[in-house]
Regions:
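Charged, amphipathic alpha-helical linker segments immediately N-terminal to NTP-binding catalytic cores
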Residues: 1-29
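Short, flexible helix-adjacent loops and helix caps
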Residues: 26, 30, 73, 223, ...
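Heptad-repeat amphipathic alpha-helical coiled-coil interaction surface used
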Residues: 22, 26-29, 35, 463, ...
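N-terminal J-domain/J-like co-chaperone modules of DnaJ/Hsp40 proteins
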Residues: 405-517
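Pre-Walker A adenine-sensing motif
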Residues: 33-43, 135
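Globular "head" domains of long coiled-coil molecular machines
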Residues: 46-287, 346
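Charged, low-complexity interaction regions
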Residues: 26-32, 385, 502
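C-terminal end of P-loop GTPase domains and the immediately downstream helical coupling element
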Residues: 212, 221-223, 230-403, 407
Length: 517
């Protein structure tokens, strides 16, 4: 069999060091059973970041994926495709491939609608398919591949095992196939905490670098009231202060997934129906919008028939319907594009995109390096050979010496409140280390469109601050060590200020949304 080529070196010193380690391991294990894992680890270093969307059944995983991509790609009903791990990648053309547990991959024809939602498995049973891979031209997928997983608490042991295998939480020897996780929960259950604990297998001191928690279906927290998202934001803020979650995920964000997905795919005919509802008398609206059953089944003189109302309820949810009607009535949304923008802003999708950009996409090199290091570590443990000691030494040199991992360890220390710094210093340190996002402008608390000179000036000021802290006679040893890490970060920010691009959350918006007026 022809050996696939090793991926070429890239611009990241950390990735280059990890790539060299993987290559050396490949030479040591040449022709042995470890080679498939090492080839896979090498390829992942050059692939887009892999981010799984995980959670319990009915947490809204597929709905959130549709919102992030801005297309109705993932099936949200209980069909057979929701029982299969499905990968969504940026591609030149639309294509769906099924990868059976045995046998070669096979292309699947589009469903009756011409898309992915109703695609047929081509005679395969769901339990015969290891994964589906959907290629779709999408700017939202250009920086990260999204992986939709079955519910973690499925009554089917096999479905839960599939999700856990993809995420590397099944207790087996296989490594996670993804670099990071968006974990959806409707409320904080003990099972959510247990899952997040199992995914925390990081060589950089087991920190929460690779996990963002989302309070999904946030509109249901307030029982469909117009202020439901405000209630959800308060709940998410409370969860974010929970010491258990602080150790397991970077942040907790409220998102109304259904509302966000509908905002991204809103149609003109839906806007016209909402406008018709908004023109009805207040008394008639109050009568209809008491319960979902009344809204879909009651007779009314409003020129939106019950079947159409039921379709609107499926698309918007009760909260989304009430909010959309109010936005049209108040003149805030006078076009479909305006309503789409307003719903998207209120659904919480913007902060989630910012988090995905700042905490995942901008840290892609660190997350991918972490995944490759985990793969090498597993190989060294499973197949010890005489050269293992040398490889192990290089592995430990990278994990202990890479500044990116030093930043992660210090972020974990700050989250734990274990440093004797003032509150202001803790906030500044957390930001400079990339805790709020890895982009230079975010680290330095300056405008994202700042010039290189402005970035450099801010970096020099931060450098001087932490140099003083490192040298201050009252600083404890732990504080001095932390300040030295921050000094190194600031030095890199100063040196790189002339070449930093301004990267923001807009990069992850779907193309259709970026074109809205």
């Amino acid at each position: 069999m022809t050996r696939p080529p090793w991926p070429s070196a890239g611009p990241s010193p950390l990735l280059d060091a990890v790539r060299a380690l993987v290559h050396r391991a490949g030479q040591v294990y040449e022709g042995g059973p470890a080679m498939p894992e090492l080839y896979a680890a090498a390829r992942r270093l050059d692939d887009p970041l892999r981010v799984a969307i995980a959670g319990r059944i009915k947490a809204g995983k597929s709905t959130l994926l549709n919102a992030l991509v801005g297309q109705e790609l993932a099936a949200t009903d209980a069909g057979e495709c929701t029982r299969i791990v499905t990968w969504y990648r940026d591609g030149h053309t639309y294509r769906v491939m099924a990868y059976p547990h045995s046998g070669p991959p096979r292309p699947l024809p589009p469903g009756p609608s011409g898309g992915v939602l109703d695609v047929s498995l081509g005679g395969l049973r769901a339990d015969e398919v290891d994964r589906l891979v959907v290629d779709w031209p999408s700017a939202a997928l250009s920086r990260m591949t999204l992986v939709d997983t079955p519910g973690m608490d499925s009554l089917s042991t096999e479905l839960s095992r599939r999700a856990e295998s993809t995420l590397g939480t099944d207790g087996e020897d296989e490594q996670a196939e993804v670099d990071a996780v968006i974990y959806l929960m409707r409320h904080l259950h003990s099972s959510d905490v247990r899952f997040l604990e199992t995914f925390r297998n990081d060589p950089a001191d087991r920190g929460p670098i690779n996990t963002i928690a989302v309070l999904g279906r946030a509109d249901e927290v307030g029982h469909g009231r117009v202020d439901a998202l405000e209630s959800a934001a308060r709940v998410a803020a409370r969860y974010q202060q929970d010491p258990r979650l602080q150790a397991l995920c970077q942040t907790v964000l409220p998102v109304a997934g259904l509302l966000a997905a509908t905002a991204a795919t809103l149609r003109e005919d839906e806007f016209r129906a909402i406008t018709t509802l908004a023109q009805a008398s207040e008394a008639e609206l109050e009568r209809l919008l008491i319960t979902a059953a009344r809204f879909t089944g009651a007779e009314s003189d409003i020129a939106v028939d019950p079947a159409r109302r039921a379709a609107l309820l499926d698309r918007f949810g009760f909260f989304g319907l009430r909010l959309s009607v109010r936005l049209v009535q108040n003149g805030v949304a006078t076009t479909a594009a305006a309503l789409s923008r307003e719903l998207s802003a209120r659904a919480g999708l913007g902060p989630l995109r910012e988090a995905l950009t700042g905490r995942f996409a901008d840290r892609a090199d660190v997350l991918k390096a972490r995944s490759a290091l985990l793969a090498v570590d597993a190989v060294l443990q499973r197949w010890p050979v005489p050269a293992t000691a040398s490889l192990r030494h290089e592995y430990e040199r990278i994990t202990a010496g890479a500044h990116e991992f030093a930043e992660i360890r210090l972020l974990d220390t700050l989250r734990a409140g274990a440093l004797m710094l003032t509150d202001l210093e803790k906030t500044d340190a957390y930001r400079v280390l990339g805790g709020d996002g890895a982009a230079p402008a975010t680290r330095l608390a300056v405008d994202p469109h700042s010039s290189p000179d402005e970035l450099r000036s801010a970096a020099i000021a931060a450098l001087a601050q932490w140099q003083r802290r490192a040298e201050h006679p009252s600083s404890t040893r732990d504080v001095r060590e932390a300040a030295r890490v921050l000094v190194r970060t600031c030095e890199e920010l100063v040196l790189g200020a002339q070449s930093y691009p301004c990267v923001g959350a807009a990069d992850l918006r779907p193309a259709a949304e970026r074109m809205l007026p």
